[in-house]
Amino acid sequence: MILDWKRVYYLITLFSYVITIFLGIAYIYNNSIITLLITLVMLIISSILYCFNNIKYYIIHLIFYITIFLFLVSRPTIDYFKQGLINTYQEDVYRFSFLAVIVSIIGLTIGGLLISKKENNKKEGYKTQKSRLFINSIRKVSLAVFLISYPFYLIRLIERLMYRVNVSYYEYYADFKSELPYFTYTLSTFVVYAMCIYLATKPNKRHSTIVLGMFVVGNVINLLIGTRNPFVLSLIFSFIYYFMRNQTEKGIWIGVKEKAMFYIGAPIMMLVMGFLNYARDGAGIGNMSISELFLDFIYKQGTSFGVLARGYLYGSNLPIKEFRNYTFSPIIEYITRGNLGILFGGTPFTSANNSLELALESDRYAHNISYIVLKQDYLAGHGIGGSYIMEMYTDYGMLGLFLLSILMGIGFIFMIKSAYKSRVLLFGITLLILNNLFFMPRGGFTESFFNLVTLQYWGIVFVIFFAATLIERKVKYTVNNKGDI
């Protein structure tokens, strides 16, 4: 008898969900926040297990669940297993926070289930010579834009690093203002846009790796500044791109070498990040063992649980306005007070860093709540961050959080499906969103797709596709049909 491991794994996943449901029922009867915490942890474990049943389409869900645990659940979990209790906040604060995360995870799962089972029976035809030629032209133009704008990307990061060398991290965060001409900023934004379009044309592994490597190397400067998130997100972005390409080109993109780099590099990176937690503040790690440093790193990432807790405690103190929306704030501000708003007479904010203006006049949740909680420390460069969960809950309540999470789950599946098709623009948009998506549990909801409404993005997209069209028309009879560069 041959054991069907796929079926066994499915039964393990089902059993995990059954345990989660029983724990949830137990919580209804005993009303214990410890039972609720264990229910939440089991729900995350079950959700992660479910992702591996169809990992080809659930890789985005998987990484998102992991970041939810890391940013929003790890701290109270570690507190409980180390101390046997959780008592930093009142019970109702923990209850709200755990339930909010549970509601979002259930919504994400339902969203994935609604769309992942629907297979697109319409098969894409083979690429015609014209299609291959056009994609090759897009590839060349987008690569040229990337290479032209990359030096400006580095220059702006180096300017930040030079400023940071002479001040503390928090002074840098509160006071830094670029002295470079504005056009350098505009050109630097094209790096990510052009990179995503270039990668969406599905170049070969060598050329893709070079471009991704340049992107990661650039973000090493962010790491030296003390800002870890861009560097970590660039690594996650590179991994998920390799994963998606490997699904249609099995064994080419992720082989023994790549797996070894991941299994060895991931723990080392976490230890380095843990060390940087202290180095950024000018402190040492003392006599911490490797395991203690590893656990400390995870614990410190869980500070975003405090956003849920403080959001619940201080929600009534948030600025009251005639119209207020945190969930879509970046888009609304771009239209009313950003580059687009300025064209129609809007007045931009005078400060881009922590300030009373952003704390009281903007609809940026992280700034509003940080000022309420920290006061003068916020103005000195400190902050508690934000979370898409608190933005949605503050604007729309638990029902809104649930419904928007369903839409997110649907969106995750749509994005991953775009990776397995030949639509360059759609895949490019997916890559742009993925570049910042996994920071959402400790950032804003709109941040990952905000660029899609900017003039810079659609301007450079138009330039790339228009130039590619001209090139295609000029050389369509002589170009190599393979379209490689």
Predicted regions, residues:
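N-terminal "leader" segments that precede or initiate the main folded domain
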Residues: 1-126, 215, 234-279, 447-485
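Membrane-embedded catalytic interface detector for glycan/lipid assembly enzymes
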Residues: 27-32, 112-284, 478-485
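Hydrophobic, aromatic-rich transmembrane alpha-helices
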Residues: 43-48, 189-202, 403-417
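Membrane-interface helix-loop-helix junctions at transmembrane boundaries of multi-pass membrane enzymes
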Residues: 55-58, 197-210, 417-428
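Short aromatic-rich membrane-water interface segments that cap or initiate transmembrane helices
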Residues: 90-99, 170-186, 390-394
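Hydrophobic alpha-helical transmembrane segments
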Residues: 97-107, 177-193, 307-315, 451-453
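Small-residue-enriched transmembrane helix-hairpin modules in multi-pass membrane proteins
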Residues: 170-173, 273-408
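Hydrophobic alpha-helical segments
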Residues: 375, 380-485
